[in-house]
Amino acid sequence: MYEYIKGKYIDMYKDYIVIENNNIGYKIYTSGSTMAKLPSIGENIMLYTEQIVREDFIGVYGFLTKDELSMFKLLLTINGVGAKAALSLLSISNVSTLKYAIKMGDEKTITRAPGIGKKTAQRIILELKDKIEIDILEEDDEQTINKVTDDKKVLEAVAALITLGYSEKEANKVINSCDKNNSLEQIIKEALKYLMK
């Protein structure tokens, strides 16, 4: 029903924030990832939203990026994963890291989310692994082209750089320029050497 909401960031609670728009305070449920990136209270923000309506509940969920909102909606398609569990998954890491974990079948990372057990993690991997696309960027003269790869070593290297604080775009670009015949450790070292120049 609502594409996004703009307004003044008023307050933060355990699993939701309050945004004021036209003298109305809106309760917006959100993830830990979005909360961590919010500006100071009192500043204006915009969140992309999804409204969930049940017999006993009506709630609005909001995220700073369309990518996180899309991932939230995708997680809700899994049997046994509700809004609370989806927020929990989006709170343990950024969207990129979660995508890589699903693509690589990394149950350990997924089960770090409170309320997500081994069976649910396996179901998430089984149902979403082939639906998730991960862009590996490479330079091709004047343009950058996107391609999807299932190369586990490359995915692990990119995920490692993201964990170290580099953006998905930076990680993808530098890893794609490394020698893929090297070991995972060598690829990461080569990438870090390039990034630290």
Curated annotation (Swiss-Prot):
Residues 144-148 are annotated as: Flexible linker. Residues 65-143 are annotated as: Domain II. SMART domains: HhH1. Residues 1-64 are annotated as: Domain I. GO terms for molecular function: ATP binding; four-way junction DNA binding; four-way junction helicase activity. Residues 149-197 are annotated as: Domain III. GO terms for cellular component: cytoplasm; Holliday junction helicase complex; Holliday junction resolvase complex. GO terms for biological process: DNA recombination; DNA repair. Keywords: Cytoplasm, DNA damage, DNA recombination, DNA repair, DNA-binding. It is found in: Cytoplasm. Its main location: cytoplasm. Homotetramer. Forms an RuvA(8)-RuvB(12)-Holliday junction (HJ) complex. HJ DNA is sandwiched between 2 RuvA tetramers; dsDNA enters through RuvA and exits via RuvB. An RuvB hexamer assembles on each DNA strand where it exits the tetramer. Each RuvB hexamer is contacted by two RuvA subunits (via domain III) on 2 adjacent RuvB subunits; this complex drives branch migration. In the full resolvosome a probable DNA-RuvA(4)-RuvB(12)-RuvC(2) complex forms which resolves the HJ. Has three domains with a flexible linker between the domains II and III and assumes an 'L' shape. Domain III is highly mobile and contacts RuvB. Belongs to the RuvA family. The RuvA-RuvB-RuvC complex processes Holliday junction (HJ) DNA during genetic recombination and DNA repair, while the RuvA-RuvB complex plays an important role in the rescue of blocked DNA replication forks via replication fork reversal (RFR). RuvA specifically binds to HJ cruciform DNA, conferring on it an open structure. The RuvB hexamer acts as an ATP-dependent pump, pulling dsDNA into and through the RuvAB complex. HJ branch migration allows RuvC to scan DNA until it finds its consensus sequence, where it cleaves and resolves the cruciform DNA. NCBIfam families: ruvA. This is Holliday junction branch migration complex subunit RuvA.
